[in-house]
Amino acid sequence: DTVWSIDYLNCIKEMENFYFSKKIQNILMVVNKDLSFDKKLKGDFNLKKNLLSKGDENQSIYTGCQILNKNLLKNINKKIFSINEIWNALVKKNNLFGFESVNKFSHVTDLEIYNKLLKSY
């Protein structure tokens, strides 16, 4: 889980403004993996001009913050599904948007990282 701080507030507001001003259907907040406290975390996406893609060497980590238009969910006929299904379909259409945070990224990946995070705060 992501450790959220007040530092993210402006970034979330900027992401929200981008979402509405560009009239897009989705946006995910990502951070460059170099800003991750846990250096073992691998990237989820690549970000270029606010578009997300996937490759062999992904440089951006999904933070856990996203805005999705409910219309993206209307064709899902399962009670339980992975949001990755929607993301992957949008990536294939070159239509998954990203917003880059420049905040340091702390994610409680496991007990070891949790204990290291405790010592750093």
Locate predicted features.
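Catalytic-core segments of class I nucleotidyltransferases/pyrophosphorylases
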Residues: V3-L9, K13-E16, F20-S21, K33-F37, ...
